[in-house]
Design a protein with these regions (language model features):
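Catalytic alpha/beta core domains of metabolic enzymes, predominantly
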Residues: 124-127, 139-298, 304
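Generic alpha-helical structural context detector
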Residues: 8, 282, 316-320
Length: 353
């Protein structure tokens, strides 16, 4: 699976009583689908995955997949505390026609999470996951930083295709890129313009019986006939060779990561400002270094303050301010105070997406 470009790590809207607000989730995903984002991360850290039970998680997967445009790559956050529970969610994501899964390291038994235990966890999940696995390194929330050497070894697993590095450490990112250069290259299916082909793009689209239409007798030699709509033309595809795909989870180093060889970025800031994040990527692809640097500088202060310092409620209020459904996070995360909301409005004054 090709995981390339800018991905939004989207939020999960809630009612005031903290039930999941599925209609607002649906509306958000539909709007993201009209953007130029490569895809969406559903129930990553920004989506408050740790706050949802398994029933809610499965329904969020389904609702988001049904609302997403077929060409958007969908990645499901499925990290749980056991191999068994993680695989169960991987299967649920596959049933909802996701394209890959994002897997964090277990945290509850942190003292027991030795390198051997962590590597065994990831290999065991990858062995049985019906979807490709993306490793998730986020030492800010998970008290375990996946060693570069371990990633280099796991990169040889046929079902582990990449890593999201949210350490914010550029040196760590470049080390990941360098040490996975020798990982086996994989053949992926892409469109004629080398963009990802998703599971939902490959979904059969042949006409169903209830799609038949009546043709008036006056238009025929005699009688009334039923004409079924023809099946949609087959999707044209080609193949492309890709290596182990390293993506940054830090908006502040998006441009530097791309220049260093990263495949893209998975950003919580893209949930509230997708266009601003995309503009960095497209300027870089167009080899306009000055414009790319300007676009990177434009989001620097806002992304740092909103995502890294104000956290989930900061991102959610920024979503509200920019026309998405944000709302409040589930407790124990505390809501923002008025001065913090005003600060976000000031930071986003010139980043209206």
């Amino acid at each position: 699976m090709l995981i390339e470009g800018i991905f939004a790590a989207i939020t999960t809207p809630f009612y005031p009583d903290e039930r999941v607000y599925y209609r607002k989730l649906e509306a958000n995903v539909a709007r993201y689908s009209r953007s130029l984002l490569s895809g969406l991360i559903v129930l990553g850290s920004t989506g408050e995955a740790a706050e949802l039970d398994d029933t809610e998680t499965r329904e969020v997967f389904r609702v988001a997949a049904d609302a997403a445009a077929a060409e958007k790559v969908l990645v499901a956050g499925i990290g749980r505390e056991s191999v068994r529970a993680t695989i169960a969610l991987a299967e649920a994501a596959a049933e909802a026609r996701y394209d890959a899964v994002l897997v964090r390291t277990p945290t509850y038994y942190a003292p027991s999470m030795t390198p051997q235990a962590v590597a065994t966890y990831y290999r065991s999940v990858a062995d049985r996951s019906p979807l490709p696995v993306i490793l998730y390194n986020i030492p800010r929330f998970v008290p375990y930083k996946i060693p570069v050497e371990m990633v280099a070894e796991l990169a040889h697993h046929p079902n582990i295709i990449g890593i999201k590095d949210s350490s914010g450490d550029f040196n760590n990112l470049t080390a990941l890129i360098a040490t996975t250069q020798n990982a086996p290259r994989r053949t992926v299916t892409v469109t004629p313009v080398f963009e990802a082909v998703t599971a939902r793009m490959l979904k059969p689209t042949a006409a169903q019986p209830d799609q038949a239409t009546f043709v008036a007798a006056s238009d025929l030699a005699g009688g009334t006939a039923v004409a079924a709509a023809p099946p949609a033309p087959a999707l044209k595809t080609r193949t492309r060779e890709v290596g182990f795909q390293v993506l940054t989870g830090s908006a502040a180093i998006t441009l530097a990561a791309l220049e260093a060889g990263a495949a893209g970025a998975i950003l919580g800031f893209a949930a509230c400002a997708p266009q601003a994040c995309q503009e960095i990527y497209f300027a870089w692809k167009d080899h306009d270094q000055k414009l790319a640097a300007d676009k990177q500088q434009r989001i620097l202060a806002a992304s740092q303050r909103i995502v890294n310092e104000l956290g989930i409620n900061g991102v959610k209020y920024a979503c509200d301010f920019n026309g998405y459904y944000g709302g409040y996070a589930r407790r124990p995360l505390l809501p923002l105070v008025a001065s913090q909301k005003q600060e976000i409005e000031s930071l986003l004054a010139n980043i209206r997406n």
